[in-house]
Amino acid sequence: MVEKRTQPLARDAMAYVLAGGRGSRLKELTDRRAKPAVYFGGKARIIDFALSNALNSGIRRIGVATQYKAHSLIRHLQRGWNFFRPERNESFDILPASQRVSETQWYEGTADAVYQNIDIIEDHGVEYMVILAGDHVYKMDYELMLQQHVDSGADVTVGCLEVPRMEATGFGVMHVDNADRIIAFVEKPADPPGIPGNPDMALASMGIYVFHTKFLMDMLRRDAADPKSSRDFGKDIIPYIVEHGKAVAHRFTHSCVRSDFEREAYWRDVGTIDAYWQANIDLTHITPELDIYDSTWPIWTFSEIKPPAKFVHDDENRRGSATSSLVSGDCIISGAALNRSLLFTGVRVNSYSRLENAVVLPDVTIGRHSILRNVVIDSRVVIPEGLVVGDDPELDAKRFRRTESGVCLITQTMIDKLGM
């Protein structure tokens, strides 16, 4: 007889978010911040999606492991995620790489980032561990994954989704049987195996793992004692369990959270400039693929106390306006025109300028008579008067980071070199 559950499994779980990665494919956008700390969607940071999923799923104990250029990430977590209360049996731990196990080692891999804090985890006394990547954009109910983990009797449950086969080189790729038990797992293969019967697609790991806590601690201690291990979940821990235990796949379509008009299960890596730009610009559509307005599954973040956005001037050639755009608080659009653009907090766009398909990070100032198309502008950049981007591909490529699809990343260092 199956024991009846009296409370959600999430109440006896800890979410452990791996947030130490650089995200080198985002180029200069991660020169000063880790990928999980990169801004997204007008207000949030990328890490807020994994954290919000945990909170909305009912998890009240969260740990975040940080490493690469962590200052802005730690500051964001301290300001935006400081509402957990011990008296309510809640906790939020920020766990920077601090050589707690060895005086000579930082986090050596994803598994080591958990192992080095094993005493903190055990002090929480939770039954389940939900290991999360902090650098993906998606909405997911982890309670449903926890339920499958318990019901299946798995040693580990791995979140997965189908992706085009040749896009799976950056993920762990698995084969499963008819019951979704994982029978083979390879990390970041150069030639990913396709799904039987659907060879153009591969079943990719989302970097989400559910364990019973005691089993995970045993696995981490065994792995730490292995001199040949690379201390990584995808390379070491998961393949070992596939071979010696029971690993089960959890399909993202079974637990993704969708509002009424979200047609497909939405998950994005946003690991390249093109992918980052596209995911942000998609939010300007009438019915975007990701609904950030879904009040039943809010994306929690740090909300600054800022005045509303303001649009000024209404002359024939000098009108502050925005079409199909997201404009955050404390922005002033002074006689400029925006189309299909997303502006974060504190942006100033001065007269006679035009922005189209622009993603503008916080506290940017755009000078008069500027024309900016298909751009990502890093925070605190000052765009000089009369700058034109998006008309001359060769000139853009000489001055800025231009992708093959024509998106330009603009940083202050690049602007300074122009001498304008």
Curated annotation (Swiss-Prot):
Protein name: Glucose-1-phosphate adenylyltransferase
Species this protein is from: Rhizobium meliloti (strain 1021) (Ensifer meliloti)
Subunit structure: Homotetramer.
Pathway named in the protein's UniProt entry: Glycan biosynthesis; glycogen biosynthesis
Stated role: Involved in the biosynthesis of ADP-glucose, a building block required for the elongation reactions to produce glycogen. Catalyzes the reaction between ATP and alpha-D-glucose 1-phosphate (G1P) to produce pyrophosphate and ADP-Glc.
Cited SUPFAM superfamilies: Nucleotide-diphospho-sugar transferases, Trimeric LpxA-like enzymes
A Pfam family: Hexapep_GlmU
Similarity field: Belongs to the bacterial/plant glucose-1-phosphate adenylyltransferase family.
